[in-house]
Amino acid sequence: MSRVSQARNLGKYFLLIDNMLVVLGFFVVFPLISIRFIDQMGWAAVMVGIALGLRQFIQQGLGIFGGAIADRFGAKPMIVTGMLMRAAGFATMGIAHEPWLLWFSCFLSGLGGTLFDPPRSALVVKLIRPEQRGRFFSLLMMQDSAGAVIGALLGSWLLQYDFRLVCATGAILFILCALFNAWLLPAWKLSTVRTPVREGMRRVMSDKRFVTYVLTLAGYYMLAVQVMLMLPIMVNDIAGSPAAVKWMYAIEACLSLTLLYPIARWSEKRFRLEHRLMAGLLVMSLSMIPIGMVGNLQQLFTLICAFYIGSVIAEPARETLSASLADARARGSYMGFSRLGLAIGGAIGYIGGGWLFDMGKALTQPELPWMMLGIIGFITFLALGWQFSHKRTPRRMLEPGA
């Protein structure tokens, strides 16, 4: 085995272990934020939505800067610093009793994410061969789902005792992750050339095809982020207990572990990437509309199943398409900018979703936020169809198995 092949093989295992630690640390804390501050402390949903939206926007909106800096200085220092910063954010969240302190903790968490997330994504592009990326992204998503359930179960159990224990556990996991990267991650360059920060950013911004694709995905993310805000609130409201939230993530894990990899393997040879992305988005949109009208957990979990199936179809295609479109001379910058759609869509989804949820309750129209999200999903579906029908993306990057 050549040294390059050996490095790629070892890199896969490193990425999988690193990803599991990050997912566990995140999901111990974040699914419980809405339950802690809305249900237990009685805050308005929009206040918590602002906090979650701020974290999302900081982490993803500034990703191009984190990616460009990583292109210049390498992945390791950015990843280690970012993970320590997120640990500090979680520690601060544990003592948050005023909205401004929750917002500050989410700001720190998001800033840490903008440092470590783009270089981690760029390492996947660097280490995994193009023909294997779709399947590797599917493996990461399966791992994300399993980690989400384990993290949510652990967080829900700790929440019975003290929210500070929840945050301390998340902080410790990110400190361990920082030490793991500091010890084992080689000083790899992300790009084929050492690209200056401004040059990497300029290269991305001049790529109109990539910019259009990323911004169009904002609507997709408005739906996707509700697994952190409105879906847990809805489950808690109908069940009458925050313990039921863990079953929502158990459903996601079961579907991902059983369907994600087989669907990705089967569809990658038969359907173009944009068709898989659009099909998944359509299923997600259709499942959102009736959620506000359900009256029991069985109906709600059925719709959540449909939503997750849509995500299982769409996510590997979205990640693979983003990676395929990245310029090898500025991988960090491209993968950082690819998060901008999540920044915009996530911020609007959290803040707008929280506001619509409060508004729906005030007007006794609980279906209002869900209907709006479904409409946004359909608009995004049409926008993606228009974009791809105009051949804005090179055909070879969209072909099955590309």
Swiss-Prot record:
Compartment(s): Cell inner membrane
GO-annotated cellular components: plasma membrane
Protein's name in the database: Multidrug resistance protein MdtH
InterPro entries: MFS, MFS_dom, MFS_trans_sf, MFS_Transporters, Multidrug-R_MdtH
All ranges on the Periplasmic side of the membrane: 34-98, 160-164, 235-243, 298-299, 361-367
PROSITE patterns named among the record's database cross-references: MFS (PS50850)
Keyword Cell membrane listed: yes
Domain of life: Bacteria
Pfam family, one: MFS_1
GO molecular function: transmembrane transporter activity
UniProt keyword annotations, A-Z: Cell inner membrane, Cell membrane, Membrane, Transmembrane, Transmembrane helix, Transport
Cytoplasmic side: 1-12, 117-138, 186-213, 265-276, 321-339, 389-402
Family: Belongs to the major facilitator superfamily. DHA1 family. MdtH (TC 2.A.1.2.21) subfamily.
Chief location of this protein within or outside the cell: membrane
NCBIfam families: PRK11646.1
Transmembrane stretches, start-end: 13-33, 99-116, 139-159, 165-185, 214-234, 244-264, 277-297, 300-320, 340-360, 368-388
Record membrane topology: Multi-pass membrane protein
Record's keyword annotation contains Membrane: yes
Organism of this sequence: Salmonella paratyphi C (strain RKS4594)
